[in-house]
């Protein structure tokens, strides 16, 4: 049986002191690894949903006309993750309310700014998956597969502003380039998810 990845080891070792950055990193990583999280992050817009609606939406996404236990179990696991972590309520990814013994899930834009290190981790994961080191914020907003805009419910404008700020605070990881009137985000060689997380935890200890 394989053990945790390098990123997983960093999260286990360093993640106890700040659960938000840990959970946002887990969410970003799951958006590449879990088909259900990827579907929920990229295909389910902000709004209010009953659990039954999400089950039906997932089955249609899978081209299955009648929802089955696979769909129900997947949604149950997703909602459990959102409920037991800061992701659902604090970060707007799916706050869960009980109404007449039924679960109502509300997905909104984050009520707080996404921490810059969590955002850079997600960008670093995109670079690792795609092999690209330069990313266009406008293209990221419209990307249905790899996008912090969709994972964290951000606009390309918000993403650009956050990355400009990140480039000032963490110039060793990220910089902004001007190309044909557009801003490009460039991730530098040290910007691995592991290095970014370690940098974050080193700084909060100071």
Task: Name what the model sees in each region.
Residues 1-206:
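Donor-sugar nucleotide-binding helix/loop cap in glycosyltransferases
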